Amino acid sequence: METFQVILLALIQGLTEFLPISSSAHLILPSQILGWADQGLSFDVAVNTGSLFAVVIYFRHEIVVLAKAWFTSLASKQQTQESKLAWWIILATIPAVIVGFTAKDFIETHFRNTLVIAITTIVFGLLLWAADRMSKAQLTEFQMGWKKALLIGLAQAMALIPGTSRSGATMTAALMLGLTRDAAARFSFLMSVPVSFGAALLVTKDLVSSPAPIDYQALGLGIVVSFVAAYLCIHFFLKFISKIGMTPFVLYRLALGAILLGLLYL
């Protein structure tokens, strides 16, 4: 891979992974516009690892507190709001794990194409707009309860369909269930950690058995660029989301979906 290609794709991954705008919709654009070949499994692992490092480091204090509270609850059988949140994150992860293990190949074969990505980008953009407009926005992530956590987890599993956007689907569900914008974003980011880690392990297993050569310099650059882009994206999204709302991202998704349809049929 050329250096420009590595930087551009890693930037796209880092900037779109945690925004509700679909990373898969953006990663398909270079191949459609520039005619680039698929970047390969090893590069996918690299840029996803960079994004995972970003969210873990950004929320390192919260993750440590939640982990300690969770382990303490196992020993003491007493629950705090932090241990409950940790349990809810685990619960919300289960649907995506089940769907990922049982339907990953089917989804990759039947849904990873430009038409599906364009349609889901538009449809789930409209759902995000409706959720943001109708949300009661009263609950924090510590107040939602296990049923709401499970429903958000089901939304995350649905986001395995390309173009849906994991963060977009989970924030949409959280807003519909009454969480504030800040709480919806924080819970979405925190619940991305176990799912991203599991996905990285799953893809790494496939990578080990792949005979394709590995460009370690490109992978290292991809990890660094993806990490920096994702970290800055998380920081500024959380800083401004309560003020700007979801409308800018909805409009962007509609435009992006229209562009993809145009590239497909024009």
Curated annotation (Swiss-Prot):
The keyword rRNA processing does not apply. The lineage of its organism: Bacteria, Pseudomonadati, Pseudomonadota, Gammaproteobacteria, Alteromonadales. One of its GO terms (cellular component) is plasma membrane. It is a multi-pass membrane protein. It is an enzyme of class 3 (hydrolase). Keywords: Antibiotic resistance, Cell inner membrane, Cell membrane, Cell shape, Cell wall biogenesis/degradation, Hydrolase, Membrane, Peptidoglycan synthesis, Transmembrane, Transmembrane helix. The gene is uppP. This is Undecaprenyl-diphosphatase. Catalyzes the dephosphorylation of undecaprenyl diphosphate (UPP). Confers resistance to bacitracin. GO terms for biological process: cell wall organization; peptidoglycan biosynthetic process; regulation of cell shape; response to antibiotic. It comes from Shewanella frigidimarina (strain NCIMB 400). Bacitracin is thought to be involved in the inhibition of peptidoglycan synthesis by sequestering undecaprenyl diphosphate, thereby reducing the pool of lipid carrier available. Its main location: membrane. It is found in: Cell inner membrane. The chain crosses the membrane at residues 1-21, 39-59, 87-107, 111-131, 144-164, 183-203, 218-238, 244-264. Its EC number is 3.6.1.27. It comes from the Bacteria.
